[in-house]
């Protein structure tokens, strides 16, 4: 065997090892990518399902329910492409396709969930943020047209405003029921200020007028409490009158 042939065999062997290593790396990267995709899609599906199931009914419209169902269907179809033999995914896809076929008649079974506490308001706000992320991600991936995505981003912001209106209104009404006009005034005042800062305040003109009336009512109750009645006598008012009389007598004596 000539030295040239030996050299060629060595070079061929090295090249073969490089090719094998490259192919193994490609296969391994493909497996890792599939696992990563499966985990990411599962997380997005979980978040989408959480929004669909727990979003308060007073903010959930058939159009919004239909959007969330479409987003969930898209994620399930992509996950099925990675896990082709998953019977559970196939069944869910069939169910979602049936719901989407109903269009605006899609059932909305979310019960109303009044926003009475700041904790509850934050929970719903987090759901809205998750919804916003789902919409923008779907637009970036080409599933949602840009015009439709823009519409839903605006609608999500509108729902956020409605959330604040309900929160401040409920907070103030609770304070009035507890005979705490000061706390009620603070809640209504926050609501009024929030609406006045909106980019399009005319959209919420009716709600603003309503909160302003409640603010005036709470403020009147606070002022009534602060002003003593004309015929009311207590230790403080009597003490003040006594001090005024003593001061007047001393002034007369020294003058």
Language model region names:
Residues 85, 99-111, 138-145, 159, ...:
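Alpha-helical linker/edge segments of TPR/alpha-solenoid repeat scaffolds
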Residues 17-22, 133-157:
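Repeat-mediated protein-protein interaction surfaces in helical alpha-solenoids
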Residues 61-71, 139-147, 188:
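Helix-turn-helix repeat elements of alpha-solenoid scaffolds
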Residues 167-255:
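Long, non-transmembrane cytosolic or organellar matrix-exposed soluble domains/tails
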Residues 32-35, 148-167:
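TPR-adjacent "capping" and linker segments in tetratricopeptide-repeat scaffold/adaptor proteins
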Residues 23-128, 132-135:
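N-terminal topogenic membrane-targeting module
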Residues 1-39:
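N-terminal signal-anchor transmembrane alpha helix of single-pass membrane proteins
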